[in-house]
């Protein structure tokens, strides 16, 4: 049997067994090496499958004259002995996800890059520059401090330095420890885009000479130019430069990911961790750059770092889109930072709500970032942040355990028992949003309506005032949906959906029009909001979809046509948010229930005619597994520490009931006629 680690369609597998991956980050480089064994033991006992950890270039590499010395075994400093750290993980039967950067952020000086990687004058390293020719400076420098120029990733010298760093990490740490020989199951390349700037505008980078030279080859047009600002669009052909530059953004990221990780290709799964889109028009910029279907061998993953989604609906929506863009593992969920980011995150209920929202929207695993508070690092890697780092993790800096640890153990055990079966269930796929990337390419430029009027076209929309509004309409009806890339999806992928809706534009390439027309002829329904395409990619007449689609004048009409999509699920209260995953062959369902209201009590829904209810405090969450029509497993967060409210957790499905004996957080697993119950009070 093939037991190698792999990721298929966003799901982690060992051999042919799907595994819901529960991971925890431990910044060993910020802790005393003497603490590692104890902390890893406690991480394992919390139900964690794998430890994720950055290997900071700045921490392990030191320059002596012109010579760079690397330390992976602690000969210069004990907490540089990452080889020992990896061995201790293996001893505890913890898998490992290694994150070599090169830029890692992690609140380290210069994002963990060594000083000699800065694009200083005379260094021979190009800076990353924006449309104004301004170099990007270290985005997380101390207030009023010197900002080192960030290197252009595809600059010949920096690229060679990075590949040499990756080769060193591979040779010294990864090569002999790849699963099944060792415990390394994946390697993460880069961090939240390039420099934690994944959501940046398409004119923010990269106008360096090295990038522009590659762009010219990519565009394959004579006299191609990289637009630095929006000029008046006087004729339809003026759009080509804007389309090409926007299309280049995703290809640019593919080049960075694949160049940096070339030594790893085909040897270990490679993952990335993308951060959420910005508000408003930022969604179009993000959709332009994030096209994972075009990154073969690079597996989609994501982070969070928004305001608490239980307290802020905009963050709720942005995080949902990030989780839903493509199935993948959540590689950073804030379980530890309340002082540095938002005070709400000191409370376990906030972390649980975020975690379950991501899973409900498609995450195939989650990460506790970080599992451990640390307090033993030197100023060479961070002279800015106070100790401990972070401030409210499940395991404190002295090794003591917290309420978060107890709750984490309950969630981890739920997915340890039920993870494979959950991953064999499917979310509702009745409705899909048709993502047509070229619409994002133009929408990101925010072209004025008067320019569109010159060639009698409606403004093109994709994310902002399109996908975001569609999601809000669907969630207000408790409707789930999937996102399908119309350019890359196969006919079989389209066939999974009864409805495909999108905000229309005046053009669409002929190949995609034909694909959608075939989908429509086979019984699917294509719904354009606004304009339907009548030109192809060359802006020539092409009306393949004219009689193969429906048109709506207003987005608000969409709900009346498709309802909530899933005819099995009914929820009357929009403040009770429910997601259903189903495997009819196994007679198994999972329900994620999130209470957005400020009221505690029963949250009601029905599925296939069976009434269901979960008793929750305000702003809390639960997950329930149903097997053969009965409650099989349940996790209910019955305590809201932030608002000092609590309930006696209870769940009902049809005539079947589970009720705890006291106000608590509870995990209940059915074993025959009895329940195995664990609580945190």
Spans of model-derived segments:
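Aromatic-lined substrate-binding rim segments of carbohydrate-active enzymes
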Residues: 36-120, 261, 507
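Aromatic- and acidic-residue-enriched segments that line the glycan-binding/catalytic groove
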Residues: 65-75, 91, 102-146, 178, ...
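Short, acidic/polar
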Residues: 29-45, 282-290, 348-357, 489
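Carbohydrate-binding surfaces of carbohydrate-active enzymes
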Residues: 158, 163, 170, 177, ...
